[in-house]
C-alpha cells in the first residue's frame, strides 16, 4: 500500500521556524516528485513547491520563496519542509502529495497542522 506519513501537529511562536516531514512507503521513492501544498482555513489549496528525490532539485511557487525550504533524505525515503519567520498567516494544514509534472497528485499525505500563536 502506498502511504505518505507526515509528522504530527506543531504549535510554534511567531518568528520561529518549523520543519515537518513526509515519509513515503509502498513504492519506489525516486520515481515521483514530492509536492507540498498549503490548506488555510476557508481558502483554496496553494502549491508551495516540489522536490525531485533523485537529486534534491526544487521548484517553488514564487509566493513561498524565502518562506519554505524543501529537502530530501533518500536513505529514509523522506522529504522535509522547513518554514521560517512564521506568522499567523502561516497557520494551516500542510500536505505532501506525490505527483509529477502536470499530472494530478495521486497520493496525499496525512497532513500536518501548524499553528502559529504566542
Curated annotation (Swiss-Prot):
Region annotated J segment, chain positions: 105-118
CDD domains hit by this protein: IgV_H
GO biological process, any: immunoglobulin mediated immune response
Region (V segment) residue spans: 1-98
A GO cellular component entry from the record: immunoglobulin complex
Domain of life the protein comes from: Eukaryota
Pfam families: V-set (PF07686)
D segment: annotated span: 99-104
Official protein name in the record: Ig heavy chain V region AC38 205.12
Organism for this UniProt entry: Mus musculus (Mouse)
Amino acid at each position: 500500500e502506498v502511504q505518505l506519513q507526515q509528522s504530527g501537529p506543531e504549535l510554534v511562536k511567531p518568528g520561529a521556524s518549523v520543519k515537518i516531514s513526509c515519509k513515503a512507503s509502498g513504492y519506489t521513492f525516486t520515481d515521483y516528485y514530492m509536492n507540498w501544498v498549503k490548506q488555510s482555513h476557508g481558502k483554496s489549496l496553494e502549491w508551495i513547491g516540489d522536490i525531485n528525490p533523485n537529486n534534491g532539485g526544487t521548484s517553488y511557487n514564487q509566493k513561498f520563496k524565502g518562506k519554505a525550504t524543501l529537502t530530501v533524505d533518500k536513505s529514509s525515503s523522506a522529504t522535509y519542509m522547513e518554514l521560517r519567520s512564521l506568522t499567523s498567516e502561516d497557520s494551516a494544514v500542510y500536505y505532501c502529495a506525490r505527483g509529477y509534472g502536470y499530472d494530478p497528485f495521486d497520493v496525499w499525505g496525512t497532513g500536518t497542522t501548524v499553528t502559529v500563536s504566542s
